Amino acid sequence: MIMLVFEGQEIETDAQGYLKNSSDWEEAIALLLAKQEEITLTEPHWEVIRFIREFYKEFNTSPAIRMLVKAIAQKYGEEKGNSRYLYRLFPKGPAKQATKIAGLPKPVKCI
């Protein structure tokens, strides 16, 4: 069992650092997870993270990259809803990193 220590509490994660229980997440934990991913969160990052959390609440699944790009484009327009923009924010993979920082399970189609 792997744990993330946050404010003196142990929070269970999987071997890749994804939270086991998404209800353990809060924005302060996102900052810690982002630091582990070597990402400094800016408002555009938060926009994607919050969007992914809402997507998860609605569909009970984390979006794979293709679905994420399409959904972001529908909500925020083509300027933000494209792979290049999302990879600039999350260089190791928008679906993978943003989902992890958002405290959600790893997307099924993520390797």
Curated annotation (Swiss-Prot):
Name by which UniProt lists this protein: Sulfurtransferase TusE
GO biological process assignments: tRNA wobble position uridine thiolation
EC number: 2.8.1.-
Family, per entry: Belongs to the DsrC/TusE family.
GO terms under cellular component: cytoplasm
Top-rank EC class of the record's enzyme: transferase
Function: Part of a sulfur-relay system required for 2-thiolation of 5-methylaminomethyl-2-thiouridine (mnm(5)s(2)U) at tRNA wobble positions. Could accept sulfur from TusD.
A molecular function (GO) term: transferase activity
Active site: C110
Gene3D superfamilies: 3.30.1420.10, DsrC-like protein, C-terminal domain
Matches recorded under Pfam families: DsrC
Keywords, alphabetical: Cytoplasm, Transferase, tRNA processing
Compartment list: Cytoplasm
Record note on quaternary structure: Interacts with the TusBCD complex. Interacts with MnmA.
